[in-house]
Structures are given as structure tokens and as C-alpha cells.
């Protein structure tokens, strides 16, 4: 089953590109035709690229990776926040801070600062031990950090891949990802450079419906990857991996259980063998008794014979 249909792409306007005077010649191979001064993107190619990107994202997440959603333009902000939150992934939908990937250690300190500020009760002035002015300054700092870093609050390391809407607007994010060799999955409009993107999806990055549809597809891939990951984790809990060595205490426990089972089995076998050993002894005892009986019979017959002679 296809991830998305041609009809959905057409209804969302994914096929509309930019004006013919605003284009990147490298995108020529993805353009189907030109109509009324606007390029029309080849949706057959888009479908195949969507399937590839979907599989890549699913496999990345299934193997424990994370995908950062990036889209700061107005058309993408709502879809990015909604879909990333749905699948529990980090996102940036306001301003991209320079160094958010390449200088993540500093960004992480700011995230810790945000968590500290969230512990303060700004309504209770007396309990905080701060003046109203100090609380006001801290609340403004908290609001600023929440706006810029709220989407990546739970991120503890750089992501395994990034999903980007409009690579021209997010050129700083693309540059940082490429510098760290982080795979880039992105929508490519007719004015973008396809060489900057690892997993491209030719499409319209300006229409809200187009951006929402493609972002939802990537979020669905993440969701499927998470399901696969949880299934694999559940299977691993049930039984140890074949090549995984046991801990020393586990080995001792296992050997102790085996020894106990062996002793129990031997104890159960001994009573069963005893009757078998007694049976021949009983037969041996009965045999002489049986032989003695015929020997006694002639002795009993002898007096009878003497009486007849008398």
C-alpha cells in the first residue's frame, strides 16, 4: 500500500513550483512542465521519493534514532509543532539558533536553565524569596527560552536525522547538519539545491496543505518506527539474545538450579530401582522353599509305607 496517493498530492497542491524566473537549474530533472509562468513538479517522481524517505525515517527510528522537525516559516509552524509533538520528537518552529547542532553542549546548558526556571512558582512571591522585579526578569527569561528552545526541551543529544521544510530559509540548519554528517530529509521546491539534501521530496514548500501533508507522512514514518522499536524491545525482554553472555551471578544461579534438578531426578530414580532389586531376592528366597517342599513329601510318605508292611 502506498504511503500517500497521487490524488492526495494533487488536492494538497504539492505539484505547484515557483515562478519560472525563480528556479534552480539543478531541479530541472524534477520538473514535469511549465504552465502560466509556474513550474509543475513531476508527482510520479515525488511519490517514489516519498516512499524512500518514509522507509529511511522508519528504519532510523526503529533502530533507536530521533528525527528533529524544522520549519520556521509561518506556513509550517503549526504543522511542525503538531506532528512532532504527536510522535514525541524534538522540533524547531520559531527561530533557528546558530549552533543548535554544532554547539549543542552550550544549547544543552540553556535547556537545563529552562528546567530550573520551570521549578520556580512565579505566583508565590513570599515563598520564592525573590523580589517582584527579580521574578519578572526571570519570567521573561523563561518565556524567551520556551519560545526558542521549548520544542527541544527533552533533547539530550544531536538527532539522527532532520526533517526540514524550505531548505533555502533553513540554510543554517542544513549547513550544520551536513557539517555533522546528519542525514537531511527535506521538501525540495523548484528554487532549492538538491545536492544539499540526502533524502529529497520534490514538492511545494509554500502551501500550508502541502507542508502539512508531507510533514504528516514523515511523522507517520516515525510512529511506525517507534512501534517497531517497542516490539523489538519486548522480544528482547522475553529471552536473552543468542550471543549475549550471561552475568556471573546469572551463571551461578542457573548452574545451581541445574544441580538441584539433577539431585531431585537421582532421588526419584533410587526408590524405583529398589523394588526392582528386591524382586530377584524374593524370587531367590522362594526357590529354596519350593525345593524344600518336595523333599519333605517323601519323608511323610515313608511312615505310611511302614504301616502297610506291618
From Swiss-Prot:
GO BP field: translation
Keyword Ribonucleoprotein carried by entry: yes
Assigned keywords, A-Z: Ribonucleoprotein, Ribosomal protein
Pfam families linked to this entry: Ribosomal_S2 (PF00318)
One annotated GO molecular function: structural constituent of ribosome
GO cellular component labels: cytosolic small ribosomal subunit
Compositional bias per record (Basic and acidic residues), positions renumbered to this chain: 249-272
Compositional bias segments (type: Low complexity): 273-310
Residue segments, region Disordered: 249-310
NCBIfam families hit by this protein: rpsB_bact
Protein family (similarity comment): Belongs to the universal ribosomal protein uS2 family.
UniProt name for this protein: Small ribosomal subunit protein uS2
Source organism of this protein record: Streptomyces coelicolor (strain ATCC BAA-471 / A3(2) / M145)
